[in-house]
Structures are given as structure tokens and as C-alpha cells.
């Protein structure tokens, strides 16, 4: 409600990687791995969330699950996503549904792991597909090495994003680059970021940066301003 009062759009995001812990985080169960955690359990959560939030005017979309990966063979992500879509549409036929790709939603490997998502059916024809993209060598966003050590160039982001963006064009789908971010320790990262953002703009794909908020402290990807909100982080110059 506070966001709506300020005209701020909100994405409701279930940030569980298609897993759930029944023991306080010691172990995690995959959705579909057992009868204790099925696609219908996830669908029921979203049915209830949609019923609760559907009348707000600032819900940009329901992001049904962040970065699913290594799913159980008997319960592929595409099947789970379809069950959730069906459940949401029972109570909300208007709000966009955001579907993250498989394998950590990788933009670079979208075709290899997430091509089957194009078979999803939304009765309201209002799906948005979400990919994530980082510039380090292992695509993880941990940025354990330097710009040079990881062999990054000014076009690394564009080259990786093309796999996702071209897929969107090929199948006439809408997309969102829901995570991207760079360290604050080398200005060359900023050039790579800027080129990516120009490419996304030119292709009509919105994006959201990872990450912000006071809880991140000195995390090198964060864009939270310092000195009582008076000093911006370097990434904000892009």
C-alpha cells in the first residue's frame, strides 16, 4: 500500500529457487520431489497471493519463482509453471505473470534450458519471461575475479543477452531482464553495463538492477547511496 501511495510499481517475487526447507534451512526439498511439496502447493500459495493483491493498481506482475534450477526429472519447471499460471487465472485474469527461466534464469543459456517455456499457455495471454545476466566468467554474479581475469569486454553483456532477446523476438514473447549488476571496483564494468542497457532499450526489454537496499552494506554490486543518501554508488552514473 505504501508503494501504491507513492506511485511505485511492485513485482511480487517468490525467492525460493523452486525449493523449500522444512527444517529451518538445514536441507531443501525440490518442488515435485515428494508429496510434501508439489506444484499444487506452489499454485495454492499463488492463488492466495493473487486473491489478496489483485485489486492493487501498482502490481507490475506476479514473479512466480526466482531462479529455478536442477529440477527433479519427474517435475520439470515448465510443468510446474503451467499449474501455477492456471491457479492464478482462477482468481486474477488481468495481472501479468512473470516466469523465470530454468537453470538460474540464465540469459546466455536460455535456449538450452528454457526454450520449452514458449509452450506455456495463459488464458489471458499476459506472460512475461524473465532472464538474469551477469558479466563474470562463470555467469554467477559473484565476480570473484577481476575484469581482465574474467576476459570481459565492453560487449560481454550484449553478447549474452542476445540469446534471450532473440528468442523473445522469434516467438513473439515479452521479456524482462530481472537481474543484472556490476562491481564498483573498475570503471570498465560500467561501460559493459551501459552497452547492455542501450541494447535492452533498443529492443524494448525492461530490466531491474541487482541490488539495492540498506541491508547490503558494502556489497560491491549494491547501488544503495551512502553518507545519509547523499553519495551515489558508481553504478548510478550509467
Regions found by a protein language model. Give the residues of each.
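Substrate-binding cleft of extracellular glycoside hydrolase catalytic domains
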Residues: 1-53
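Hydrophobic beta-strand scaffold residues
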Residues: 10-12, 175, 207
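Short, solvent-exposed turn/loop segments enriched in Gly/Ser/Thr/Pro and often Arg
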Residues: 15-19, 101-103, 210-217
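Short secondary-structure boundary/hinge segments and terminal tails
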Residues: 21-22, 186, 217-218
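Extracellular glycoside hydrolase catalytic/binding regions
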Residues: 34, 40-61, 65-205, 221-233
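Short, intrinsically disordered, charge-balanced linker/junction segments flanking boundaries
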Residues: 235-237
Amino acid at each position: 500500500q505504501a508503494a501504491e501511495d507513492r506511485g511505485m510499481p511492485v513485482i511480487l517475487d517468490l525467492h525460493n529457487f523452486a525449493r523449500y526447507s522444512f527444517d529451518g534451512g538445514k536441507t531443501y526439498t525440490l518442488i515435485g520431489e515428494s508429496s510434501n511439496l508439489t506444484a499444487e502447493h506452489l499454485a495454492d500459495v499463488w492463488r492466495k497471493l493473487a486473491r489478496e493483491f489483485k485489486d492493487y493498481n501498482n502490481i507490475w506482475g506476479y514473479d512466480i519463482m526466482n531462479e529455478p534450477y536442477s529440477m527433479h526429472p519427474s517435475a520439470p519447471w515448465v510443468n510446474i509453471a503451467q499449474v501455477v499460471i492456471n491457479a492464478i487465472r482462477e482468481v486474477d485474469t488481468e495481472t501479468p505473470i512473470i516466469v523465470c527461466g530454468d537453470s538460474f534464469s540464465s540469459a546466455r543459456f536460455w535456449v538450452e534450458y528454457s526454450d520449452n517455456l514458449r509452450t506455456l499457455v495463459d488464458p489471458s495471454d499476459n506472460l512475461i519471461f524473465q532472464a538474469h545476466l551477469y558479466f563474470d566468467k562463470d555467469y554467477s554474479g559473484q565476480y570473484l575475479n577481476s575484469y581482465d581475469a574474467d576476459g570481459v569486454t565492453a560487449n560481454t553483456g550484449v553478447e549474452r543477452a542476445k540469446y534471450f532477446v532473440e528468442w523473445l523476438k522469434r516467438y513473439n514473447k515479452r521479456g524482462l531482464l530481472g537481474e543484472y549488476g556490476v562491481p564498483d571496483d573498475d570503471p570498465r564494468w560500467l561501460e559493459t553495463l551501459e552497452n547492455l542497457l542501450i541494447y535492452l532499450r533498443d529492443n524494448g526489454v525492461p530490466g531491474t538492477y541487482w541490488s539495492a537496499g540498506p541491508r547490503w552494506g558494502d556489497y560491491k554490486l549494491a547501488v544503495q547511496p551512502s553518507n545519509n543518501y547523499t553519495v551515489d554508488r558508481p553504478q548510478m552514473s550509467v
